[in-house]
């Protein structure tokens, strides 16, 4: 009899373990496949990200796009991603052979598929026709089956909200008074229709994918007003997760004259209301989304502004600035720095005595664990080499994971693996932001 009791207990323990593996915190890890096209140390291949995968529950390959004529899902670089070329889709999904618990999803949109004129038009036009939606859904199903993906991440592109200036109390009152006469600008004249049509698209996708157990998730991109474009009560039951990209709240492209925290957990004093992790998570919770479906995005990079004389010497944000700072040496994007590039600018034995553009930045941590870290270097007498940098590091990433755990949310997402310290150049550990966040869940 004892044998059967022990056997039953072991069976139950196995069931609990399997259930925990399925329902435990999600760690969604994005990989931008086009990073494999870079040169030098900025080149990040599928092989380079393998050491991160034991810490990820899902790998999201980004990004696919939409064909503007047929409204079918398309690879943004067929020669790189399809089997007829280098087959990078297949390289990503075959990782499951070595990491059998890993789910590999294809992400569509993500601000990678923008036309120069009317950048969001095809994503909105697709929604407006049942025939276009059907063509898209069918092409999604075909692509997932062909390349052995486990599901789809909808990083759908909607018109972005306009940048807002940071105003004090007096400025807010005056701005509100002016709006009585000028009114609000219209983001999308057909927003109500697009809201209903996006709900229909998600429902159609779910119906097409559910029989094959495909995962369907939604990523809410930065500067997308979900209260305008997303009917949360109708969407939530058709989604396996809702991933909130709660970062890039301020960027040097959108806010060139004002540097500030790019990804605070809570709202700093006298800032734009809602531009923080807690506000976005609270919105989805209040709309009835199960906490276990909400995933919080964590960037692996920083944003930099150029400082000038009028920026002052304190470095305290919000700080006057003059557009993006110079590009990082490997990412090559104005005002953008991977964590490895950020780390190289912070004080270390190798740069302690350097001057000019190589002089280390002054690092300001976040003892409150609410707003994030920043670093800066005031300009010299010629107004050169000044920089203000808001960034994510392992400590702040861990704070966000702790927030997720305390709130009982569904997990975290890493944007993205290629901008973490892939080679361990900073402190020897590879993927330190991912690791720090994972350990705090």
Curated annotation (Swiss-Prot):
GO cellular component, one term: extracellular region
Record domain GH18: where: 25-441
Matching Gene3D superfamilies: 3.10.50.10, Glycosidases
Predominant localisation class: secreted
Pfam family, one: Glyco_hydro_18
Record bears the keyword Disulfide bond: yes
Additional remark text: Immunization against the protein decreases early inflammatory responses in the skin of mice bitten by mosquitoes infected with Zika virus and partially protects susceptible mice from lethal Zika virus infection.
Function: Promotes recruitment of host neutrophils at the bite site. Induces expression of IL1B and IL6 in the skin of the host. (Microbial infection) Enhances Zika virus replication and exacerbates disease pathogenesis in the host.
Name assigned to this protein: Bacteria-responsive protein 1
InterPro entries associated with the record: Chitinase_II/V-like_cat (IPR011583), Chitinase_insertion_sf (IPR029070), Glyco_hydro18_cat (IPR001223), Glycoside_hydrolase_SF (IPR017853), Glycosyl_Hydrlase_18 (IPR050314), IDGF (IPR015520)
Assigned protein family: Belongs to the glycosyl hydrolase 18 family. IDGF subfamily.
The keyword Plastid is assigned to this record: no
Keyword annotations: Disulfide bond, Glycoprotein, Secreted, Signal
Gene null: resulting phenotype: RNAi-mediated knockdown reduces neutrophil recruitment in the host skin after mosquito bite.
Disulphide connectivity of cysteines: 29-56
């Amino acid at each position: 009899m004892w044998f059967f009791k022990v056997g039953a207990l072991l069976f139950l323990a196995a069931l609990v373990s399997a259930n925990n593996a399925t329902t435990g915190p999600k760690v969604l890890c994005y990989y931008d496949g086009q990073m494999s096209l870079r040169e030098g140390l900025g080149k990040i291949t599928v092989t380079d990200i393998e050491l991160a995968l034991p810490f990820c529950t899902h790998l999201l390959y980004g990004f696919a796009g939409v064909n503007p004529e047929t409204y079918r899902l398309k690879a943004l670089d067929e020669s790189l991603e399809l089997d007829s070329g280098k087959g990078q889709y297949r390289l990503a999904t075959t990782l499951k052979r070595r990491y059998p618990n890993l789910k590999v999803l294809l992400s569509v949109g993500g601000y990678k598929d923008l036309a120069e004129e009317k950048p969001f038009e095809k994503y909105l036009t697709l929604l407006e026709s049942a025939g276009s939606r059907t063509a898209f859904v069918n092409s999604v199903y075909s692509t997932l089956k062909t390349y052995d993906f486990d599901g789809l991440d909808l990083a759908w592109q909607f018109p972005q909200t306009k940048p807002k200036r940071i105003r004090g109390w007096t400025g807010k009152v005056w701005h509100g008074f002016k709006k009585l006469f000028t009114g609000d600008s219209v983001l999308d004249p057909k927003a109500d229709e697009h809201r209903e049509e996006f709900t229909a698209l998600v429902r159609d996708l779910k119906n097409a994918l559910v029989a094959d157990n495909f995962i369907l998730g939604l990523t809410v991109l930065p500067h997308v007003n979900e209260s305008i474009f997303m009917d949360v009560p109708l969407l939530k039951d058709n989604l396996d997760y809702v991933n909130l990209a709660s970062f890039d709240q301020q960027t040097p492209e959108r806010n060139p004259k004002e540097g500030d925290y790019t990804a605070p957990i809570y709202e700093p004093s006298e800032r734009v209301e809602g531009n923080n992790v807690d506000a976005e998570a609270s919105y989805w919770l209040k709309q009835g989304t199960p906490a276990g479906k909400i995933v919080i995005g964590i960037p692996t990079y920083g944003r930099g502004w150029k400082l000038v004389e009028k920026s002052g010497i304190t470095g305290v944000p919000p700080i006057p600035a003059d557009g993006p700072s110079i590009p990082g040496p490997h990412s090559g994007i104005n005002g953008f720095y991977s964590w490895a590039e950020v780390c190289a600018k912070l004080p270390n034995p190798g740069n302690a005595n350097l001057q000019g553009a190589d002089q280390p930045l002054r690092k300001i941590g976040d003892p409150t664990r609410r707003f994030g870290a920043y670093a800066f270097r005031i300009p010299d007498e010629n107004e050169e080499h000044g920089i203000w940098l808001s960034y994510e590091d392992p400590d702040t990433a861990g704070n966000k994971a702790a927030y997720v755990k305390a709130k009982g949310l569904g997990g975290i997402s890493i944007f993205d693996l290629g901008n973490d310290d892939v080679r361990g150049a900073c402190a020897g550990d590879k993927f330190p932001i991912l690791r720090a966040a994972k350990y705090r869940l």
